[in-house]
C-alpha cells in the first residue's frame, strides 16, 4: 500500500507545486522512516552497539606543560540507539522531475552513552579505569530519492559531528588537568573513529530497510 501511495504522490509532486501533494508524500516518507527505525531497533547489534577497540598516541599542550602519552579503549559499547526517532517532517522537494527528501534522526533525551574501559600511560601514570561518554547531540542526516515507481533510494547518510560530548572518567575530577587532556583526546576519537564505526553499522541498516521493495 505504501508503495502505491508513493507512486501516486510522486507523480503529482513531479509536475505540481500543490502543497496538498507535498503533504501526502511527506506523510508517506515520514512513515517509511518510522517503520525503518522500528525495524532497525529490533536488531541485537544496534543497542548496545559494539565498537572495535581503539589505541592511540597523543600529545597536548596545557600552558607551558606538554602531555605525551598513549591510551587504549576496550570493550566499547554505545547505548541508547534503540531510542532513535525522526526529528520533524521530511523536507520534500521536486527537482527536475525527481522527488528528493532530507531528514534528521536523533534519539529520545538526545543522549547516546558510550561505555568502555580506558588504559592510559602518561608519565609515571599507568592506570586502567572505566569511562562513560555521553554524546548529547547525536544526529543522523540522510537524503532520499523516490522514483516514479515509488521506489526509495538512500543517496546520503551522515552521523553528524558531535558538538557536545561529556566525559565521566573514573578516578579523575574535572578540575584535574589530566582529565582535561584525556577528555580532549577522547572527544577527538569520537569525532573520527567512533562516528565512522557507527556509520558502518547504521548506514547499511537504514539502506536495507528503506530500499525494500
Swiss-Prot record:
Gene designation: DERF7
Lineage: Eukaryota, Metazoa, Ecdysozoa, Arthropoda, Chelicerata
Organism: Dermatophagoides farinae (American house dust mite)
Residues with attached carbohydrate: 151
Disulfide linkage: none
Coiled-coil regions listed in the entry: none
Compartments reported by the entry: Secreted
Protein name from the UniProt record: Mite allergen Der f 7
Protein family: Belongs to the mite group 7 allergen family.
Gene Ontology cellular component list: extracellular region
InterPro entries: Mite_allergen_7_sf, Mite_allergen_group-7
Pfam families: Grp7_allergen (PF16984)
Keywords on record: Allergen, Glycoprotein, Secreted, Signal
Signal sequence range: 1-17
Regions crossing the membrane: none
Amino acid at each position: 500500500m505504501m508503495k502505491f501511495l508513493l507512486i501516486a504522490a510522486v507523480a503529482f509532486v513531479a509536475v505540481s507545486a500543490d502543497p496538498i501533494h507535498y503533504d501526502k508524500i511527506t506523510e508517506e516518507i515520514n512513515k517509511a522512516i518510522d517503520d525503518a527505525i522500528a525495524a532497525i531497533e529490533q536488531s541485537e547489534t544496534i543497542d548496545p552497539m559494539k565498537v572495535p577497540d581503539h589505541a592511540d598516541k597523543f600529545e597536548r599542550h596545557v600552558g607551558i606543560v606538554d602531555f605525551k602519552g598513549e591510551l587504549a579503549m576496550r570493550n566499547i559499547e554505545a547505548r541508547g540507539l534503540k531510542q532513535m526517532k525522526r526529528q520533524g517532517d521530511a523536507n520534500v522537494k521536486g527537482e527536475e522531475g525527481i522527488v528528493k527528501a532530507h531528514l534528521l534522526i536523533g534519539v529520545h533525551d538526545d543522549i547516546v552513552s558510550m561505555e568502555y574501559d580506558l588504559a592510559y600511560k602518561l608519565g609515571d601514570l599507568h592506570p586502567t579505569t572505566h569511562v562513560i561518554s555521553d554524546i548529547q547531540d547525536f544526529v543522523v542526516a540522510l537524503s532520499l530519492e523516490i522514483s516514479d515507481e515509488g521506489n526509495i533510494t538512500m543517496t546520503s547518510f551522515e552521523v553528524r559531528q558531535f558538538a557536545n560530548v561529556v566525559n565521566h572518567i573514573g578516578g579523575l575530577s574535572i578540575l584535574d588537568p589530566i582529565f582535561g587532556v584525556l577528555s580532549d583526546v577522547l572527544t577527538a576519537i569520537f569525532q573520527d573513529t567512533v562516528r565512522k564505526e557507527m556509520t558502518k553499522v547504521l548506514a547499511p541498516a537504514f539502506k536495507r530497510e528503506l530500499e525494500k521493495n
